Amino acid sequence: ISADCHAGAELLEYRPFLDKEYVSQFDAWAETYEVPYEDLKGPDGPRNWDSDRRLADMEADGIVAEVIYPNTIPPFYPKSSLTYQPPPANSGDAARRWAGLRAHNRWLADFCSRTPGRRVGICQINLHDIEASIKEIRWAKSAGLTGGILLPGVPPGVGLPELYDINYYGPLWAACEELGMPVNHHGGSASPAMTEAVESPVIF
């Protein structure tokens, strides 16, 4: 069993999983969006979303089941949600980012359902809205994303309290405990914003 696999939809595959009110905005955004990661654009990119190819590759490696973290770009996000994200520019930006995360979670639930018992998906949340995060966690549990939640990093400059702030995050921890949802954190996701220098990604 692999406890740290990554997957996600090809960009346009997220479209049917978006709330209807965001579809036209997504079309406009996707028209000019350039995927920034070469590995997602090359011949190995489909390993993230091609279910049959993924199964074949897993079986060739002797892997019978996997825990799935995100690897692609959620709609309306400037880059991978595993990395530093600047605070939303405004309420519209915040709402669109949430719509993108929900689309990813829905896609992932569908992806996992195609191979019962072999894929365990991890739900993404946005810590800028704890109430919405709790609602999404409850949905994830009901949708079979039993891998729990992905706790985003909180580096300086994102406009959020440190993760040990019980007054802010307490309701989130309580909901995870109530639902039996594991809390996952991916290494590197709390790295602060760096320069554009070539060596900066090493910090991740």
Per-segment meaning from a language model:
Residues 1-204:
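Helix-coil boundary/capping segments in enzymes
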